[in-house]
Amino acid sequence: MKRSVIFWLTIMLTFDIFAQPGFLTVAEKSDFKSTSNYKDINDYIDKLLKSSPYIRRETMATSIEGREVPLLIIGNPLPKSPADLINDKRIVVYIQADIHAGEVEGKEATQMYLRDLLKEKNPEILKNVVLLVCPLFNPDGNEKISPLNRTYQNGPENGVGVRFNGQFLDLNRDAMKAESPEVRGVLTNVFNKWDPAIFMDCHTTDGSYHVEPTTFCWMVNPDGDNSLIAYMREKMMPEMSKTLSDKYNILNCFYGEFFDMLNPGKGWVLDASEPRYITNYYGIRNRLGILNENYVYADFKSRVMGCYYLIHSLLDYASGHKSEIRNILSETDKKTIAKGDNPSVTDSFAIDYNVRPLPDKVTIRTYEAELVNETNGWKNYHRTDRQQDVTVPYYIDYYATKNVRFPFAYLITIKDPAITDLLKIHGVKFEKLSADARIEVQRFDINELKGSTKLNQGHYTNTIDGKYVNGPVDFPAGTIIVRTAQPLGNLAAYLLEPQPNDGILFWNFLDRYLVPQWGLGYNQYPVYKVLDRTDIKSKPEI
């Protein structure tokens, strides 16, 4: 009885606190002239924690400069850990903001959404959803707020942070190589630990002129399960768009940019398909990834409110379709495991791909543009005041142009903790060969290895050419075995295949092993493929 009285007293006090005018975000208090810094965010989180029994905080990561990356868990009942959700019918949704700290709408919108959600006595959404929120994924970049950053952006006038983290890394290019504490934190403490069904990452556009303040799209990499891409493209995203427009009165369109601003009829394209982009990465994991891009030239308040109502639209959909989504994801995992357990000759993995338009065109509200000679000698597009609506092809359907066989397993012959640690961070399961064995495999013989001429995120990234050769190879006990009969089998393939544009070879994890000391010829690529189902004696990795 005493505990019940305390609980309801807490609820009553909650609504007194939420009713106070002081429970506003920095953006709201400043009439959308400013955005929150690190202290502002943490003070606001403290208010939320004191005001509601439905929220708690964890630390997802600690940045290179020593700042905590917050993870907020919201639920009714509030789970203490993922173990509480084993027999729970609710769906887990994760929303992340400020991965680029100059793109701050999501940071403000998530704070506002949580306040408004938690002031309800018994939030309807929380009957069906466990919500995870990180309002500040890049705290080091956020602390560099200045009006000199992103000066072309339409507010907030008192400035925003910078794109990169404390290591000068773009966190939205780090999903595969996982070099930053922030990305390692989200992989370990959110994706692996909580396994959200849906993930949305909030950004601001840098591209074409249009009217809609809010844009979004879905994961697109063709090495993810195509049935999930089709579900988002054909059902989930159109329904969210309609809700955002009809229920919340927010103009919106699917994200992209024009091939040619002077001739927008050529098409609207999403040109970021690799899994280094974290929403595409999430699709490779057999889950639903959403990219939110708020229109850079809309005023700051419109961008924040558009993002705020997009969050509403997402959670409306997730709450109303929780069973459907859970079933789709469960079936996709089973399908991936079955493919890896006994792959056929037709099971393939794309190592190169291209984009084509969807069958249906999209309408974008845009402006005529002019190409202007700047005083510095550059030529830039300038928007005119002449608005036009264009119905154009939407290039977002990525498809394979070159495939290799999807294997039963990969065998890794080098014992490098950087590689095994990377597999663990991603949640990819692996074992070790329990005894010496001769195994029929496919090896990759290198003909040419090239590093890029320019640095990319601190790397001279690799491209490789060679040929596949089948035959028996003797492997010693302790050889690492990565079986593809696991939910993350597609991710394992992307990391370990020699030729993808985002694997361990591309990001230089194998450089020291590929070229002999004196630089003559090439060593054997140290990852072998077991193409067909094979009895491999193994022991678990401890």
Feature map (PLM): residue ranges:
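Soluble metallo-hydrolase cores and metallopeptidase-like ectodomains found primarily
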Residues: 39-93
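Cleavable N-terminal signal peptides
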Residues: 6-7, 17, 173
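Positively charged n-region of N-terminal signal peptides that target proteins for export
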Residues: 1-4
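Catalytic centers of hydrolytic enzymes
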Residues: 409, 421-425, 431-432, 448-542
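Active-site/substrate-binding loop(s) of hydrolase catalytic cores
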Residues: 86-96, 104-237, 241-265, 270-273
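Boundary at the C-terminal end of the N-terminal hydrophobic targeting segment
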Residues: 17-24
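Hard-cation-handling environments
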Residues: 258-441
